[in-house]
């Protein structure tokens, strides 16, 4: 106690307690002001009568929706909802699909599950279809309430292309449609070599004016992506020049010796030089030719021996 009768406390002990009491008082006063401000803000708002019920309903609805989603039942729920709404795809009309099976089309478009007319994307469906090997163009239309119309323009197989040990079916532009399988296509031209797929159509069309030759062709072989060799059904090879191949063939055919040469035991006919035709005998013909020559030489020796 000091001289004035007041109790004196140690500053380093009681100062902290005093500040705590002061801060509590200030905070309580601050809380009251904030509460009073918020009360004045909402005091003028007219709360609807059923706001509480709506809040409770929203809470339960969101809880059920979360349970369906987390439990993995959303797909089934969507299927039932779409079906009950009447916008479920129930009819799919298809046209132009000769090579691509109907069930394959339904599968790649996801129409084998629970398609919705509303959510079905026709642009995406068209893109997916045009990525299929046999499809060149596709058109997809919605016909409400429950029908889709799919029209396809498929690629036409033009030839069988052999290259690098592989055999593929190509169209007339050289586009590779699919790997070759026996029985999948019939009566197609057979082209061989790098670059043959791009130039085969023009060459085969140009050669079609000479059916007496083309009917015997078994394979069109592209050599060095520069020129063509023709392999005939009898095993004969016709070697064509790099430039003016069709004109050279025309001259050869018009000379009237083609049919005669085709019936002989010849392995190669070389037309690469414009001023001559070079012919190579087959192995069998060459063997017979050598036998004939040897026999003639033997007879000649016998005649000479008899005359002596």
Swiss-Prot record:
PROSITE patterns in UniProt: POTRA (PS51779)
GO cellular component: cell division site; plasma membrane
Transmembrane parts of this sequence: 54-74
All ranges on the Periplasmic side of the membrane: 75-308
InterPro entries linked to this entry: Cell_div_FtsQ/DivIB_C, FtsQ, FtsQ_C_sf, POTRA, POTRA_FtsQ_type
Subcellular location, record wording: Cell inner membrane
Membrane topology: Single-pass type II membrane protein
Superkingdom field: Bacteria
GO biological process: cell septum assembly; FtsZ-dependent cytokinesis
Residue intervals of the POTRA domain: 87-155
Cross-referenced Pfam families: FtsQ_DivIB_C, POTRA_1
Cytoplasmic side: 1-53
Family annotation (PANTHER family): CELL DIVISION PROTEIN FTSQ (PTHR35851:SF1)
Record's function text: Essential cell division protein.
Homology family: Belongs to the FtsQ/DivIB family. FtsQ subfamily.
Designated name of the protein: Cell division protein FtsQ
Gene encoding the protein: ftsQ
